[in-house]
Amino acid sequence: MTDDTWGLLRKRLLKTVGQNNFTTWIEPLELDQVDGGVATFHVPTNFMGNYVSQNFADLILHEFNKSGEAVQRLAFKVAANSPTRPVQPTMSEAIEEPAPLQTTVVDQLGNQEGNTSVKSPPEDLQAAPLDPRFTFDSFVVGKPNELAHAAARRVAEGGPVTFNPLVLYGGVGLGKTHLMHAIAWELKERNPELNVLYLSAEQFMYRFVQALRERKMMDFKHLFRSVDVLMVDDVQFIAGKDSTQEEFFHTFNALVDQNKQIIISADRAPGEIKDLEDRVKSRLQCGLVVDLHPTDYELRLGILQTKVQQNRKNYPDLKIADGVLELLAHRISTNVRVLEGALTRLFAFASLVGREIDMDLTQDCLADVLRASERKITVEEIQRKVSEYYNIRMSDIIGPKRLRSYARPRQVAMYLCKQLTSRSLPEIGRRFGGRDHTTVMHGVRRIEELKTIDGQIAEDVEMLRRSLEA
């Protein structure tokens, strides 16, 4: 096998595993030789060889065979001056009597009981681990996520299946994975015998590819169709992967026909996932589809207050000055993970230097985070987006006309300017045809009132906010 052939394989692997995984795990591999059906690689460490063997061997073998290379297993050895100790190879030969597979939540959490008699592919299915921090008790509920939280609670009660599937979608760091883990924990607590399988869509694809290669599709089908609850995270990963979507579709149908619960998460609504087959979209949309909206100020502040109480266990003597949490909730608005990470950094830094967490320390410690989180949305951008959304001219928003069809979008634009920019009310008024600050204040308050009683206005504002912050 030539280096050029391995180079082509690497390019295909890059497309499959993504840039981060490729850079970390595939790029360091140095092909030594292909001989007797064994592809041998040099790796920097035994750990890397073992990790690649467990997580990427299926894909690498698949690509070898697609290229016409009769590779049946991979071997890894550490490049060193001393004699190298080969890493345990990954076998591709079919095993006649594979070991039983543990598929319940109890097994995934490290408990040794509950083995099923389901036969598996040669390697046990590595279900995604559950984070013990992600429970319903630790989930902070606010208006942006209250519906998703209520739906997750209902499913976790484990009674009759009322909506199937439950699809949770939203941007990064809004709580999808937290709710997925919380559901699994609650189901486990209520019924330890329940057969719950939680995994990522990426893991589903890897197991599918392995089953195809080893001609173990019946085992694969039996495994996934014998669960009581199937939970698949980040379903958008299978978009564009036709064979995987085909099997996912049939698995989905089989479980629904058995009245088994399915819970899915995605980074956007099913109908908006590019390259996802229409029939899969249709299936996902036939249950309850719930959006986790971007956090508002009150929810972010509540999350910070909860995290402070949790951090008190490790930092009982630290003090936080008034206004610090409010500053963070106001300035870090797009990603809860960044928000929580900022607070963790603050606690660690203050503890190391022995200082109170005040405004000065916050500005010094989090200068990069606060700078990156500064709002860069302009008044003009908001005016343009709002006029496009309501299909009116930008001059009508700025102009003097007081028709309802112009006045309401104008008030929405003023409200968004107040929320998403640092402009003062008089400055905003000047950008809206020279209006004074009292007019802007009235418009802002009017939209705040309407959001609570008019679902359409609330949806309009949220859609525009997400569009502007994207």
UniProtKB/Swiss-Prot annotation:
GO MF annotations, alphabetized: ATP binding; ATP hydrolysis activity; DNA replication origin binding; lipid binding
UniProt binding sites for ATP: G173, G175, K176, T177
Organism this protein belongs to: Ruegeria sp. (strain TM1040)
Subcellular location: Cytoplasm
CDD domains in UniProt: AAA, Bac_DnaA_C
HAMAP family linked to this entry: DnaA_bact
Region (Domain II): 79-128
Name of the protein described by the UniProt record: Chromosomal replication initiator protein DnaA
Homology family: Belongs to the DnaA family.
Region (Domain IV, binds dsDNA): 351-470
GO biological process: DNA replication initiation; regulation of DNA replication
UniProt subunit comment: Oligomerizes as a right-handed, spiral filament on DNA at oriC.
UniProt keyword terms in alphabetical order: ATP-binding, Cytoplasm, DNA replication, DNA-binding, Lipid-binding, Nucleotide-binding
Record's function text: Plays an essential role in the initiation and regulation of chromosomal replication. ATP-DnaA binds to the origin of replication (oriC) to initiate formation of the DNA replication initiation complex once per cell cycle. Binds the DnaA box (a 9 base pair repeat at the origin) and separates the double-stranded (ds)DNA. Forms a right-handed helical filament on oriC DNA; dsDNA binds to the exterior of the filament while single-stranded (ss)DNA is stabiized in the filament's interior.
Ranges where the record places region Domain I, interacts with DnaA modulators: 1-79
